[in-house]
Amino acid sequence: MARYEKQEKKDFVRKNEQIRVPQVRLIDSDGTMLGVKSVTEALYLAKQQELDLVEISPTAEPPVCKILDYSKYLYEQGKKLKDAKKKTAKTAMKELRIKSRIASHDLEVKIKHIEDFLKRKDMVRLVVVFHGRENQHRDLGEQMLHDVAKRLEPIANVEGGLQVTGNRMSMIFVPKN
C-alpha cells in the first residue's frame, strides 16, 4: 500500500515561456512602467538584460509582468512570508486545575504560575474541580475564582466570565496589552 505525502499548495508563478497571453503590461527591472507589450517583445527585452519575465499579477487585464531575477524574486517572497509568520501573535491556552479545598500556599504557587503564563502572553484557564460531596459547596469554588480574578486584575482580563460544566468551574484569563 502506497503512502501519499500531503503536498503543500504553492502559489505558482509563471515565468518566461510559461506566460501564454498575447499582451502583458510590462514593468522594467528598475520599476518603470513600459506599457502594454506583446509577450514576445517582453521576453526579448528580458533576455537582453539577462533577466526573467515574471508574471506578477495574473488576474489583471492585461496581466502585469515584471523583468527581474526569478531566483531573487522567490527569495524575497519567502522572506516576506517568514516575516509575516513572525508578526502573527502566537498565544497558547494554558490550563491549571485545582481542587476546591486547596491549601492557601498551594493556591499562591498556582497564582504565581498563572502570572508567569500571562507575562508570556499566554491565555490561562483556571479550573476548579469538585469531587463527591464538594459539589454541595460550589460557592467556595466560585468565591476562590473571583478572589483570583481580583488578584490578577492588574495584569489580566477575565474572558467570558465564570463557566460551569459538570463538576468543573472555570475562568479564562487573558493578558492585558
Swiss-Prot record:
Keywords: Cytoplasm, Initiation factor, Protein biosynthesis. The keyword Cytoplasm applies. One of its GO terms (molecular function) is ribosome binding. It is found in: Cytoplasm. Its main location: cytoplasm. Pfam families: IF3_C, IF3_N. One of its GO terms (biological process) is ribosome disassembly. PROSITE patterns: IF3. Belongs to the IF-3 family. IF-3 binds to the 30S ribosomal subunit and shifts the equilibrium between 70S ribosomes and their 50S and 30S subunits in favor of the free subunits, thus enhancing the availability of 30S subunits on which protein synthesis initiation begins. This is Translation initiation factor IF-3. The gene is infC.
